């Protein structure tokens, strides 16, 4: 067996790491316009307030499993320099839609150490926060994994204030029509190379694969995780154009549906039905998954 393969196998975690979505983020110019579009697609939203970075504000849709869908946008009277310096400035300034995702490990420090031991780059945790419209202050820290901030690997988040204040501004899930963020679909240039990166970072077994011509992608899903990798089937596809514009980032999010959805022709992804919202109206790709 080649030494390089032995080294790669030795660097894998002994057991696969459990990844549970803390939140998934959609970016745009105007948070209220984003809220209206989501509400038209059947999702209620709550305004969450401005961030302390002088660049962005957010709204969210939270779910019974604790995850939430963040709508992040440029705040009124934002500092142009702060917006330009923001990790997601391209998506913010061009209504780019899905841009990042986060997980909340039980022990952030231990997870940073584990990832670095697997030769995965992790930044030092950085403190952030925002004030809710009701005046409640929320504080957390986040660490960037890999070269992007939640673009490929999820960033890590740890709360200093009770997590419920961040996820449930009204004290309960925004909606019970959907169970949570079940899949994060990440657009990638090289499917095999991306699979290898996730397996090295998290110890996942080999993924299941399928093609979806209508979505325009070759797909790979790590069973039991939210991670779906998608590479374009055609150089002329919307997915190829998206990768050229934004790089390897989330291109779609899929929510678990709490009820059977009555549709004529759902997509079939890995044994489950996926119903897609109208991306032309919403401005990005959002799916609803049923058994």
PLM regions and their residue ranges:
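Sec-dependent signal peptide recognition
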Residues: 1-8
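Generic detector of N-terminal low-structure segments
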Residues: 8-9, 290
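Hydrophobic h-region of N-terminal signal peptides that target proteins for export
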Residues: 9-16
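Glyoxalase I/VOC metalloenzyme domain signal
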Residues: 17-21, 26-45, 63-209, 213-291
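Charged, often glycine-rich, active-site loop that binds/positions anionic groups
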Residues: 58-62
């Amino acid at each position: 067996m080649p030494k390089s393969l032995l080294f790669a196998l030795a660097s894998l975690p002994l057991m696969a790491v459990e990844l549970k979505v803390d939140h998934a983020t959609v970016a745009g110019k105007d948070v209220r316009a984003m809220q209206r579009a989501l509400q038209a697609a059947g999702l209620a939203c709550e305004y969450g307030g401005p961030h302390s970075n002088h660049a962005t504000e957010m709204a969210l849709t939270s779910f019974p499993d604790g995850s939430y869908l963040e709508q992040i946008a440029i705040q009124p009277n934002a500092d142009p320099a702060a917006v330009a310096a923001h990790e997601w400035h391209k998506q913010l300034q061009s209504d780019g839609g899905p841009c990042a995702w986060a997980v909340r490990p039980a022990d952030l420090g231990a997870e940073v150490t584990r990832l670095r031991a697997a030769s995965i780059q992790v930044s030092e945790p950085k403190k952030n926060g925002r004030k809710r419209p009701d005046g409640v202050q929320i504080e957390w820290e986040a660490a960037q994994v890999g070269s992007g901030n939640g673009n490929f690997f999820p960033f890590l988040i740890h709360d200093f204030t009770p997590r419920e204040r961040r996820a449930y501004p009204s004290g309960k899930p925004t909606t019970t029509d959907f169970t949570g963020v079940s899949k994060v679909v990440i657009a990638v240039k090289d499917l095999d190379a991306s699979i290898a990166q996730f397996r090295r970072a998290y110890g996942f077994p080999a993924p299941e694969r399928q093609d979806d011509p209508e979505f325009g992608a070759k797909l790979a899903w790590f069973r039991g995780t939210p991670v779906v990798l998608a590479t374009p089937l055609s150089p002329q596809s919307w997915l190829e154009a998206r990768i050229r514009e934004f790089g390897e980032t989330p291109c779609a999010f899929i929510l678990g549906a709490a009820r059977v959805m009555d549709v004529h022709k759902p997509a079939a992804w890995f044994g489950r039905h996926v119903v897609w919202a109208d991306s032309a109206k919403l401005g990005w790709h959002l799916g609803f998954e049923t058994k």
